[in-house]
From Swiss-Prot:
The species this protein was found in: Aliarcobacter butzleri (strain RM4018)
Residue positions of the active site: C51
Pathway it works in: Porphyrin-containing compound metabolism; protoporphyrin-IX biosynthesis; 5-aminolevulinate from L-glutamyl-tRNA(Glu): step 1/2
Purpose: Catalyzes the NADPH-dependent reduction of glutamyl-tRNA(Glu) to glutamate 1-semialdehyde (GSA).
Protein name: Glutamyl-tRNA reductase
């Protein structure tokens, strides 16, 4: 059994392919996770789908077979040829899968190094699979350590400061284009988490912000969370606002373009539209004078600047990821050893109990001496097992740990199930 991660991201796929791979609803995610868990080789699974990546995180009995099965099902879902997906996919297993997952959680694999959204998105994906029963002990353990790693990276580096999200990068680009942002109108289409971040950065940059959404009530609630005044307009005014507003950033979860060649108006002013949604909100075929359209992949210049400024911090962060990956596997081995050590002592107590009762029954010892004899036997067992227990704990740091675990279980007839029911709570799940 090994960890397996199949990754499609901005590093190996363009936005056109990521649009087809994106999971836009919980229903789609639920159906896909059910499908990949139907076979006997994929045991637990999490699906992470964001504007820049689709990651399938699993435990598998057969890496090659499981990878092929998952990509086949993804090909059916996305209507993309299997060979195309298989050639593009980054497939990680065992320690490589853990290192990649920790890098993703720590925002080192993001389009914008150090962006702050990914760990929350990963927690949401984990919660979803937990609630549906699609992941249990093994995935919980690795996710716990992934969030622990991300927290250490944030604490030890300054990667979480500055322009560190797709939304903030889009706003930074808009600010570079406009120059003086005082009284410059900016329109945000959508009222979700990405839109909230966008509004926050637009306000901080001095723009006059308007929110528009199909759900006007949701837009009003979002606007009310800011200390400065944020305008809210009904959705039927979208076309009119697109004519008069120089900056527009759209981040809806619509599964299809909401701004098309048919409804995109022309204008006499210079306009700059930023589409940070995947699938894209703006039809890629729109082209007119005085209009520039930027997708997520078009923000690469700022991303490259971001990466060069953060290179030293990223080096420190990767060191943390590597160390935490090694610690994780050592921790896993210790979790396997500790229940065995405990069971050895329990087994000794069971034997003491059985033999003392039998001796009293046969008249070999007086019942009034039972407590003292138990104490003596327990002292003997404890002293006898002390060195083997210490050796077992030391062996947990070595590669032969798995072999030793099985051997000790067989030698002492220990119940294997008792060592595998150590359900682990993810302490970092409730933390932001």
């Amino acid at each position: 059994m090994s960890y397996l991660v199949i990754s499609f991201s901005h590093k190996n796929t363009d936005i056109k392919l990521r649009e087809k791979l994106a999971f836009n609803s919980d229903e789609d995610k639920d159906r896909f996770l059910k499908l990949i868990l139907e076979n006997d080789i994929t045991k637990e699974a999490i699906l992470l789908s964001t504007c820049n990546r689709v990651e399938i995180i699993t435990r598998s009995l057969n890496i090659k077979q499981s990878s092929k099965d998952i990509i086949e099902k993804l090909a059916t879902y996305s209507k993309v040829d299997f060979d195309v997906l298989y050639d593009r996919a980054d497939i990680y297993d065992a320690d490589g899968a853990v290192h990649h997952l920790f890098s993703v959680a720590s925002a080192l694999d993001s389009l914008v190094i150090g962006e702050t959204q990914i760990v929350g998105q990963l927690k949401d994906a984990f919660r979803f699979s937990q609630a549906k029963g699609y992941c249990s002990l093994n995935i919980t353990r690795v996710m716990h350590y992934a969030f622990k790693c991300a927290a250490q990276v944030r604490t030890a580096t300054s990667l979480g400061t500055g322009s560190v999200s797709v939304a903030s990068t889009a706003v930074s680009k808009a600010k570079d284009i406009i120059g003086n942002t005082k009284d410059v109108k900016a329109l945000v289409v959508g009222a979700g988490e990405m839109s909230e971040l966008t509004v926050k950065h637009l306000i901080a940059s001095g723009f006059d912000v308007t929110i528009i959404s199909r759900d006007t009530k949701k837009a009003q609630n979002l606007a009310s969370t800011f200390e400065v005044h944020v305008n809210v307009e009904p959705y039927d005014k979208l076309t009119q606002l697109l004519i008069t507003t120089p900056i527009m950033i759209t981040a809806t979860s619509a599964p299809y373009p909401i701004i098309t060649k048919e409804n995109a108006p022309s204008s006499n002013i210079n306009r700059y539209w930023f589409d940070i949604a995947v699938p894209r909100d703006i039809d890629e075929n729109i082209s007119m004078s005085n209009l520039e359209i930027f997708s997520v992949d078009d923000l690469q210049d700022i991303v490259n600047e971001n990466m060069s400024l953060r290179a030293e911090q990223a080096k420190t962060a990767y060191g943390i990821v590597s160390r935490m990956s090694l610690e994780f596997f050592e921790w896993l081995k210790s979790l396997e050893i500790e229940p065995i050590v405990k069971n050895l002592y329990l087994k000794g107590n069971e034997i003491i109990d059985k033999k003392v009762k039998n001796a009293i029954k046969k008249g070999f010892i007086d019942s009034k001496d039972e407590e003292n004899i138990r104490k003596l036997c327990l002292t003997v067992i404890t002293e006898y097992l002390h060195n083997p227990a210490k050796q077992l704990k030391d062996i947990s740091k070595n590669m032969e740990c798995d072999l030793v675990v099985g051997t000790v279980q067989n030698m002492f007839s220990l119940n294997e199930n008792s060592t595998s029911k150590n359900r682990y709570k993810c302490d970092h799940l409730s933390k932001n």
